[in-house]
Amino acid sequence: DGAGATILEKVNENGGIINHKSSTFTSSDEIDFLSVEKSYKIENNNQFIKMKGRKVYEFALRNVPLAMKSCLDDSSFNINQVKKIFIHQANKKMDHAILNRFYKLYNSIPSEGVMPMLIEFLGNSSVATVPTLYDQVLRKKLKNHSLSKGDIVLFASVGAGMNVNAITYQV
């Protein structure tokens, strides 16, 4: 696992957080996606956190693109102005599916390189994936990815609980 932090301060210039959407889903269906249970190994009585991975995957594909669209639509920007999309990197296949479903909501397809990825190098580093990825792109440490002042980006995540978040941000 990893950790990420962001320092926010009020400034008298354009940029920063333009809009955000956050939702927590607490119905009995979503709460059941995670549980604490005994190991599958008979000789081990320890308790482990278990996740219904397919259910989480389906939940993410259903809810994250909608949160991203709602967040972007309520900002003063459109899909063609988004330079990069940073999605929590739990699963590369899932992130690509989220990205494609998001663009499909606009009857569009994602441009090449709009979604930088580090999962093949860092794995799923928990809440650190988005801040780490953003930092790597800002510092031009990720080949073929960069940002400039004024660029519009989207941040998105899905997490245990179940929580969905999206932020429209201007660099």
Locations of the language-model features?
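Short, surface-exposed alpha-helical recognition segments that flank or form part
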Residues: K55-A60, F121-S125
